[in-house]
Each structure stands twice: as structure tokens, then as C-alpha cells.
Amino acid sequence: RSLASTEFTYNQATVSGTATFVGDEHAALAVLINRVANLIAQRTRRGAGNWAVVSPASLTVLQSATTSAFARTTEGTFEAPTNTKFVGTLNGAMRVFVDSYASDTTPVLVGYKGSSEADAAAFYCPYIPLMSSGVVLDPTTFEPVVSFMTRYGYIELTNTASSFGNAGDYVGEIAVQNLSFS
């Protein structure tokens, strides 16, 4: 989340216009997500943001918004080791994931991932997926333990002195404040 160069705030208490009910105020979050996605397209010249990671509270807001075109997924569930799950699409183009462990005030993260592996904000490159040490004795407790090791490379291209320093252009963040469901 520290990579995001665009930061907006969704504050439900300051949503303008006359809302008929709370779902009208919730629609402003979907509009703001689209705004950040389009700013990503403007900065990268590649495409609009095509994925978002939201908290369970922000997901509820998207699901209850009146004019939002959020469609729940009918695909199988994707459970990552971090418990980030694919939950649906927004406006038919943006894949929405939920971080089940996120608090209600966790910002919405919007990003772009292109069709090639080099068209992204950051790169995770495992070159030894997982190695086991075998069973060894813990010297303090004398219990048998197994340790696992990995070797990998992770890079964010953030040096703005070169043309590769545009990783922050691929990601935007929306702070969430004063959510109300009534």
C-alpha cells in the first residue's frame, strides 16, 4: 500500500447531493474507484486500473450501492495464503478482491496489471520456491522442529531518475472514513 501514488478519500459524511437512502451515498465509492482507475490509465498510458483490493466493510458498501455495477462472482473461490479472495467485478472490467483480515478503515487499493508479466507495479520472482531443513532439535527446548526457507527477489521500480521509476503510477489508494449502513 505504500507504493500508491494517488490518494483519495471516501468520506460518507461529506457525500454531496440528496441521497434517497444510504445506498445512494454508497454509490460514491464506486465512482471514486472508477476515478482512480482512470487516473492510472492517464499516468501509465497503458490502461485503466483493472483490480481492486477492499476490506469487508468496503465490499459491503459496493454491494449495497444503488448505481454500482458490482457483480458477484460465480466462479470458484480463490483463497490465497493471505486470505485474499476474488469476490466479483465492478463495471464488468475491474476484478475485486477482499482482504478478509482488513479493518473497516483499511484503504481501498486500486491497480493495473497488463497482459505481460513486465506490465505491473512490482515483481515477485521466486527462484527457489521452498526448501525444508529436515527435522532438527531446537537447542533451547530440545523439541524436534522443521524449518522452511525460500529465496526470492522482489522489486518495485521507484527510482524516478529513470523511465523505470513509475511503479507508483500503476497503483492508487482510497482512504475510507465515516462508513454508515443505516
Stretches found by the model and what they are:
Residues A19-R45, N50-W51, A57-S182:
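Sequence/fold signature of self-assembling virion shell proteins
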Residues L3-A4, A52-V54:
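Generic low-polarity alpha-helical segments
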Residues R1-A28:
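Extended, well-ordered alpha-helical scaffold/bundle regions in very large, multi-domain proteins
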